[in-house]
From Swiss-Prot:
It is an enzyme of class 6 (ligase). ATP binds at residues 12-22. InterPro entries: QueC, Rossmann-like_a/b/a_fold. It holds the Pfam family QueC. Zn(2+) binds at residues 200, 215, 218, 221. Pathway: Purine metabolism; 7-cyano-7-deazaguanine biosynthesis. It comes from the Bacteria. The gene is queC. It comes from Gluconobacter oxydans (strain 621H). Belongs to the QueC family. This is 7-cyano-7-deazaguanine synthase. Catalyzes the ATP-dependent conversion of 7-carboxy-7-deazaguanine (CDG) to 7-cyano-7-deazaguanine (preQ(0)).
Length: 242
């Protein structure tokens, strides 16, 4: 089987980071497909946001519409059933005994990327794009650069492929992620992702803030709000640095 050197598969949850990664991929590759996962997450509303974002991205420019390919959703309910975490159970968000946030789903990104690689092999895609980062993240060990590099080696050895795992957000924070969004598509794309992506762990799409929708109190909302505030402060029109 010949793997296309210019086809990408984006892990696309419907959140800010993965939406930015989708725009990044559409700016670089000839064909881009997306994959999302249903794993019993409390914020399953993000899966509904995926379709809206894909439609908006396709309408963003003729080039992006031509490049955007098929969407895939994979059922990983067993992952949620195994995980006693605040993302998959009705539990108060806090720290676990090991010091990690109890929103950490053990092995989630490793499993996501493994399934993505299996799908990429079937879809003849060499490039796999994920929005993990270790700049202003929650301490999840499967978001670290070392983990992703090790996994790339493992997947290529185990599947006899030459996949490239791309992490365009690995070394930038949430404010810089908005900068990247603006660089990719101007204020129009910033507004699109602000309005239609979802970050809130509580699945709240009823309360709208200047940074997007969410409960405004969970760690994901706090991180997004802080990133938006710093992004706005850095813009010349708001008196920040150029």
């Amino acid at each position: 089987m010949t793997i296309s050197s210019n086809t990408a598969l984006v892990l696309f949850s419907g959140g800010q980071d993965s939406a930015t990664c989708l725009a990044w991929a559409l700016s670089r590759f000839d064909r881009v497909e997306t994959v999302g996962y249903a794993y019993g997450q409390r914020h399953a509303i993000e899966l509904e946001c995926r379709e809206t974002l894909r439609n908006e991205m396709a309408a963003f420019s003729p080039d992006w519409k031509a490049r955007l390919g098929e969407d895939h959703t994979i059922d990983l309910a067993s992952l949620g059933a195994l995980s006693e975490t605040a993302l998959t159970r009705e539990a108060e968000i806090g720290l676990s005994e090991n010091g990690l946030p109890n929103t950490f789903v053990p092995g989630r990104n490793i499993i996501f990327l493994t399934f993505a690689a299996a799908l990429a092999a079937r879809r003849n895609a060499r490039h796999i794009v994920t929005g993990v980062c270790e700049t202003d993240y929650s301490g999840y060990p499967d978001c670290r650069d070392d983990t992703i590099k090790a996994l790339q080696v493992t997947l290529n050895l185990g599947m006899d492929q030459r996949f490239v795992l791309h992490t365009p957000l690995m070394w930038i924070d949430k404010a810089q992620t908005w900068d990247l969004t603006e660089e990719l598509g101007g204020q129009k794309l910033v507004n699109l992702i602000n309005r239609d992506s979802h970050s809130c762990y509580m699945g709240d799409r009823t309360h709208q803030h200047d940074w997007g929708y969410g409960c405004g109190t969970c760690p994901a909302c706090n991180l997004r709000a802080d990133g938006w505030r710093r992004y706005q402060q850095s813009r010349p029109s708001h008196g920040g640095a150029a």
